């Protein structure tokens, strides 16, 4: 299945899905305002998918203002909360996969420390999560 980022108007997305038989990759659940209103956001996106005419969905996890390898424990806690909210949205919407960013920035973190540090976050995050295929996306990694 090929997925197209839902970065266009819904009518344009519907035309693309209908013409090419694609699924949708949505960033809606990477946006904090949508996560703050999670139930309403899920209902709204469910309706969008219905109108667009597909149930094939990939979610892109939060990536702004969050960081799974942050030194600051409160930032990691906020990241965990946002990632869990996105995961819940994925469950309810039947997403095939959720894409998350690793948080690696070579200008801030040493690779050796980063790998050990971020592994702790991801082990905690994936504990008891078996319903989705989770993917880590490279942002700054080389």
Regions found by a protein language model. Name each.
Residues 69-142:
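Active-site acidic/histidine proton-transfer and metal-coordination neighborhood
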Residues 1-85, 91:
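N-terminal pre-domain/capping segments
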């Amino acid at each position: 299945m090929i997925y197209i980022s839902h970065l266009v108007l819904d009518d344009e997305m519907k035309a693309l899905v209908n013409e090419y038989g694609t699924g949708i990759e949505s960033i809606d659940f990477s946006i904090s305002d949508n996560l703050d209103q999670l139930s309403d956001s899920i209902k709204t996106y469910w309706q969008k998918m219905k109108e667009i005419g597909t149930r094939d969905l990939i979610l892109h996890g939060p990536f702004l203002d969050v960081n799974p390898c942050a030194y600051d424990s409160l930032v990691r806690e906020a990241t965990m909360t946002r990632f869990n909210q996105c995961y819940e949205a994925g469950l309810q919407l039947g997403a095939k996969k959720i894409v998350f960013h690793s948080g690696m920035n070579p200008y801030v973190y040493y690779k050796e420390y980063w790998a050990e540090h971020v592994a702790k976050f991801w082990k905690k995050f994936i504990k008891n999560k078996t319903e989705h295929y989770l993917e880590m996306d490279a942002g700054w990694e080389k």
